[in-house]
Structure formats: C-alpha cells, structure tokens
C-alpha cells in the first residue's frame, strides 16, 4: 500500500484525513513516523525499481467499496460458522481501511507521475485507459 508513495509536506501532515487520525493520532505521531520512513528508509528501496506500473483506482472511496465487496464474497463463500469469525463487518472494514487512507490518497495523487504505465480502472475494475510515460 505504500510502495512508491512520496512523503507528504508538514502542512499536509498537520490535518487528520479521517476519524481514526483525528481521534487516535491527534498529535500526528504515527503519520509523521510513517512519513519519515517514506522519506528516508524506503527511498533506497524505491530507487531499485526500474519500471513502474500502476493500477489506479478511481478514488479512495472506491478502494473501500472494493474491500467491502471482497469481505462480503469471502463471507458468502465460507458461510457463517464460528470458524470464520475473522470476517470483518462493514464498520470494521471502515476502521481498518482508515489506516491506509492517507497513503492511498497520496499515491493516487503523486504516483502516476513516476510510473511508466498507469492503468486507470473504473468502479468495476475495468481498464478505461492507459497512460504511458512520455
């Protein structure tokens, strides 16, 4: 979820992007830590990539919808036995995905500029068009 994501500016980090950041990281400790890792430790890894391809979702909201769809399909496949109690409810999915909202939105905004190919997806995961680096 963070591969290739550019670090954000201090101004971008100042404001929480969702309820989880607002309520559980009001001082920005976690988001600043993650940002520092992106700026420092991850850069050497990112530099090893010689070719970048992105499957670009239409939005973070759509990523959330896809995650719910995935969980619902898993629940339908496994049934309702207690052995499968790890299946998340919609509220649990909403909380879970908030951990990745900042990185996802940042990647949707900045990652296409560094990719060799960007495959734009619609809500049904169909490729609508392909961007090739100039």
Feature annotation, model-predicted:
Residues 2-134:
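Conserved NTP phosphate-binding and transfer environment spanning the P-loop NTPase/kinase superfamily
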């Amino acid at each position: 979820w963070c591969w290739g994501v550019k670090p954000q500016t201090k101004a971008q980090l100042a404001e929480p992007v969702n309820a989880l950041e607002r309520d559980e990281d009001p001082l920005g400790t976690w988001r600043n830590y993650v940002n520092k890792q992106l700026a420092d430790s991850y850069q050497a890894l990112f530099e090893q990539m010689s070719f970048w391809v992105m499957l670009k979702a239409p939005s973070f909201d759509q990523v959330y919808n896809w995650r719910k769809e995935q969980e619902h399909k898993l629940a339908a496949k496994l049934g309702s036995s207690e052995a499968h109690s790890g299946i998340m409810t919609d509220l649990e999915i909403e909380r879970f995905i908030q951990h990745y909202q900042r990185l996802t939105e940042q990647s949707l905004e900045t990652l296409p500029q560094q990719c060799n190919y960007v495959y734009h997806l619609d809500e049904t995961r169909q490729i609508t068009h392909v961007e090739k680096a100039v």
